[in-house]
């Protein structure tokens, strides 16, 4: 499924709300860290330079500051709000500004405190941050720095070299640490630390090229690890392979989840899948969710980014940098080649959302005649539609039927009569939406003769 909502109304399927570009032309670099501030604004940090953009509560975007660090590179490698301060990291330095003094570019110019603290290891790739037990923890190479609101400690915990801290999360009252060594090393570890012992509490080793991100859920943590779409469930001690983002992975076809491209939205888990090489899978904002405990968990590509290519979704050769929840909406930063942006979840529905069936093979050794196709719906607003196409015998592309679909408004059924002789058949159903209205369907039935 791409862009569909199987959760809000049980037993029916309809289009999701769409992502719409909110940043205009203001954001001109890839954002990998975002902060939702207590001052009612959001801040967006460039991964390519020291640029920091502000989004006001009214949705106005402004470049408020460009960081120039006292040493090392200027691009942002981590950011958070902690105890009323907006804190961000560059390679060698930590910087801050009071959120109440950070409204607009003039306040940033007057009140920012650059080079507030200095890192020991000066890692040039990641300085992830997490708040736990009233303290702020920041990754720096193989060390974990700590700020308790008064004292900054550059090395509150160290782990063994050559492991590098790539992402941070929390479980219970503990901090969890995700690590990475090198793209050629298929082994890494997750550490759990109680924040006060001289060493970590537990660790678990997995055969993956790094831990990419911790994905927060209700009373548990999911973990993105490696370059092949693997999602693990973490119980505080052990990692257990839970799901896999569907795709065809190899040494030249890999994907990743960036450390801040995760969020929890209305009880549903979101994570952004980015291409590394070869486009092994569809890319965008995936969701793991369910309506209630009585329903199974479903993983789907819920939110394609706002970019389009002649009307089609852009779900390859992109990156999702960061996802944050903003009330009842989300902000999603992305990169598409040399185009960048931050999307906001819209009230309009996603025109073109679709699902593909499993391949149907009634008798794989003989041809079958597929004759009648019926879609039962409970709502089909004016000018909306659900349109079928088919792929027979693994051609890899979908064909438009030669006969028209017929809508029976009394039975609320969309019918298609088209004789398709095939050993294997797959269907695609595309939703046509109009502003905030979407079809809502209950089932798809296929008949054979």
Spell out what each predicted region is.
Residues 1-70, 75-114, 125-126, 133-156, ...:
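N-terminal beta-propeller domains
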Residues 26-29, 71-73, 120-123, 129, ...:
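Conserved loop/turn at the beginning of each blade in beta-propeller domains
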Residues 55-57, 90-91, 97-102, 295-300, ...:
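Non-cytosolic beta-sandwich-type ligand-binding/adhesion modules
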Residues 156, 202, 316-320, 409-419:
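Exposed aromatic-hydrophobic patches
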